[in-house]
Swiss-Prot record:
Involved in unsaturated fatty acids biosynthesis. Catalyzes the dehydration of short chain beta-hydroxyacyl-ACPs and long chain saturated and unsaturated beta-hydroxyacyl-ACPs. Keywords: Cytoplasm, Lipid A biosynthesis, Lipid biosynthesis, Lipid metabolism, Lyase. This is 3-hydroxyacyl-[acyl-carrier-protein] dehydratase FabZ. Pfam families: FabA (PF07977). One of its GO terms (biological process) is lipid A biosynthetic process. CDD domains: FabZ. Disulfide bonds: none annotated. The active site is at H47. Belongs to the thioester dehydratase family. FabZ subfamily. GO terms for cellular component: cytoplasm; membrane. It is found in: Cytoplasm. The keyword Ribonucleoprotein does not apply. SUPFAM superfamilies: Thioesterase/thiol ester dehydrase-isomerase (SSF54637).
Amino acid sequence: MDIHAIVKQLPHRYPFLLVDKVIELERNTRIKAIKNVTCNEPYFMGHFPGRPVMPGVLILEALAQAAGLLAFDAMGKVPDENNLYYLVGIDGARFKRPVEPGDQLILAITIDRVRGGIWKFKGLASVGDEVACEAELMCTMRSVGEPDRS
């Protein structure tokens, strides 16, 4: 899946679209995607000057965006302006190595389970053979304008 197909599936846009390409997609099971990390990313100006490092929360967001692509494919749906896919939880997030300009971040997501409209995924972000981040992610789809139940 190239960037043209990705922007039809995700509502995110620059500077918050964090998936550049899907290289593997196995329906109802797993996805592998790429985020090419460049020195032009706006967050590098302040994180950290002289030693730029991709913020961990953005690595988690990249994993969540890849999970959204997998979920919409599994549901056989195309998102529209009436529905959004929300990240609702993160468990066990661990950061193992910094992600720097020039790195190619590989985003590997597998579906763990779907229960009561909540999707649970296992996510692994790596650079080459090194794990950069691992986490369990939970997401759900909501209609825009649906009342908040919290």
